[in-house]
Amino acid sequence: SYGYRKIIKKNIIKNLKRPIINLHISYLPHNRGADPNFWSFKNKTPKGVTIHEIDSGIDTGDILFRKKIKFLIKKDTSFKHTYFILRNEIEKLFKKNCTKIISGKYSKIKQIYKKKLKLKKNLPKKLNWDTPIKKFII
């Protein structure tokens, strides 16, 4: 799953022979839920991408692979710019580990999450893709 905004029902997950995986553009367990790119800057948490198993929670499944990403934020760097970098990085992480995912040859990292889930409705109203990060956050 990537960009899928629906919650998969517990009975469907339970009855599958293999786990469902999700490609998430945050460095889990930080910034679970919607719009993790924004929240990573707002809350000054690590930025990155994660491939994890889907469980009955929202972005709470075991971590399979993840990568931290460092951004050089200039005056005009927008959320759109950083989103496309994250999207590119999650694709590269998936391609690099696709064979391991298919074969099931990977180690799992249990998530320990203490932070609150981020919801789309919590986003500031004035935020848009072209908003410069420095203007809005820093």
Task: Label every model-predicted segment.
Residues 2-134:
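Donor/substrate-binding cores of folate-linked one-carbon enzymes
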